[in-house]
Amino acid sequence: MRVLVIGGSGFIGPHVVDALENAGHDVTVFHRASKRSARREILGDRQHLGDYAGQLRALKPDVVIDVILSSGRQARALVNVFRGAASRLVALSSCDVYRACGVLHGLEPGPLEPVPLTEESPLRTNLQTYPPERITMLQQVFGWLDDEYDKIPVEREIRGDRELPGTVLRLPMVYGPGDMLHRFFPILKRIRDGRPAILLHEKTAAWSGPRGYVENVASAIALAATDSRAAGRIYNVAESETFPEMGWTAKIAGAAGWRGSVIALHPDGTPQHLMPAGNYDQHWTVSSARIREELGYEEPVELETALARTVDWELANPPEEIDLKQFDYAAEDEALGDEASHLRTITVGTLSLPSGDGAKRPAVV
């Protein structure tokens, strides 16, 4: 198949390109700068996609995968450029489209959403989940993000054209080497600093959300892009087993070879910098059963390998700027000394994780 990947040189894109090329597809990458040795590339700015319409349409791609769509305006431009020239569009969306995400952030009134979320679960009624200051921060990391960032309008545009079929993939929190958000860093910094324990507010400790390793997420994208059964469909992409934050923290710490304790604290004994920002009674777990059942998706990289690769990269590539307010060790030492506030403890190295029914089961971290 002839596949055009828009934005193929960032965190996820190169892995998508690799998966497609390894499967024998003819891939062209449209991006701003050549950061990788692509077999075929077109240099340009996706913020002005229409300026490159002639070159892009001349490719006559079977599928266009847009890795960096951030607004309805961008999605509308994408559809207009490729209508009549491509056979299908594939857009990367996010699990933040669900109403549950709005409840989590305190932006949606009403009851909690039941989980796991499926592709039919209610979407947010309020657009633009993130405040302007958060968008500004994200734009410093992701240069392709525009001021109108919201994946709900993106999905409407991609799935709303009668002539050009679209596929939408709702991605999880993606981790792996090259993660510009450094999701593992707060845990690994404490380990590197010799902390005896990692502390979590009890609500944070129990909370769970969708995750995916970057190579596995890329594999799902490549699969959906090259399987005609995916036309017109929406798919959640996430690991099939979701760990609560306490267990996930222990997994990461174990992959780093750490021996210590992960402790869930009573709210009254939790330092201010560890207080949850949001309604953590609302879990964000999603089901990825549809893509597994319809397209036969399976993760090519096992969890233990994914964690080890990510830990190794993060230890070698810490962020350049660190918010030291996140690491108030004096306050954490005080909480450690208040054993009455310790509600649950996982000892990494001799670990038993509680299963969903509260029973103990062995786990390797």
Pin down the residues of each PLM region.
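Glycine-rich Rossmann NAD(P)(H)-binding loop
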Residues: 6, 176, 200-207, 235-242, ...
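Conserved beta-loop-beta element that borders a ligand/cofactor-binding pocket
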Residues: 137-144, 152-178
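NAD(P)-cofactor binding segment of oxidoreductase domains
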Residues: 57-122, 152-156
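Rossmann-fold cofactor-recognition segment
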Residues: 37-50, 68-69
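A conserved structural motif in NAD(P)-dependent oxidoreductases
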Residues: 210-217, 302
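Mid/C-terminal beta-alpha module of Rossmann-like enzyme folds, strongest
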Residues: 220-283, 288-290, 321-365
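A conserved pocket-lining segment of Rossmann-fold NAD(P)-dependent short-chain dehydrogenase/reductase
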Residues: 190-212
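N-terminal Rossmann NAD(P)H-binding glycine-rich loop of SDR-like oxidoreductase domains
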Residues: 3-23
